[in-house]
Amino acid sequence: MGNYLSVAVELVCGLGILFIILKLLGKTQFSQITPFDFISALILGELVGNAVYDHEIKIKEIIFASLLWGVLIYIIEFITQKMKSSRKFLEGEPNIVIRKGELQYKVMKKNKIDINQLQSLLRQAGSFSIQEVEYAILETNGMVSVLPKSDFDKPTNKDLQIPSKSVSLPITLIIDGEIVRDNLKEAGVDEQWLKQELKKKNIDKTEDVLFAEWHKNKPLYTVTYEQSRST
């Protein structure tokens, strides 16, 4: 029983330490990850994971090792912010893999990327043919940024001489049958208005709604549990 309790305490402490360190280091540890970010997060996770199941290592040692690793990563991140020359070495640099519509084979080979991988990355960026691309930049996080050729670029309202309209963010009002009350205030509506809108759609209870979204000047969008099960 004592061993189980010890593992439980170490897991909770390890989780808390990792969470605090990631909050301090910023979102780059789990979003838009670079090779260095990946290595640092992997080692930090392994450090705590191995320590949890090694009964000879005490909680104080886990905390010390994790905090020391966090401090080292923070120092390196600080250096990359202050010294531009260090960024290329630690984080890498963007590379142009398509320039003026032409594939840059040497750059692709240098970055260990083949045609199939490039096509997949282009599709994720919204381009389904290499012929549509004027420039494609392989970013340090492994994603591709695309500048389409003018013939394939989407026309803007300005191009079509259409008067611009103000835009607003869609706001989720119901998730899993529960009203998100903070979002009601954000949308400038109340619970009574929401129930009235649901009645217009022949929905009697909010518990029947899987998802509901408000968007300015648009009707309330809803998906009921019944609808989701029938598709």
UniProtKB/Swiss-Prot annotation:
Q: What is this protein called?
A: UPF0702 transmembrane protein YetF
Q: Per the annotation, which location comes first and is thus the protein's main one? A: membrane
Origin organism is Bacillus subtilis (strain 168)
Indicate the family of this protein: Belongs to the UPF0702 family.
- Which Pfam families does the entry mention? DUF421 (PF04239), YetF_N (PF20730)
Show the PANTHER family listed in the entry: UPF0702 TRANSMEMBRANE PROTEIN YCAP, UPF0702 TRANSMEMBRANE PROTEIN YETF
Gene Ontology CC, one term = plasma membrane
Topology of this chain in the membrane: Multi-pass membrane protein
Residues crossing the lipid bilayer are: 5-25, 33-53, 59-79
Q: Where in the cell is it found?
A: Cell membrane
Q: Which UniProt keywords apply?
A: Cell membrane, Membrane, Transmembrane, Transmembrane helix
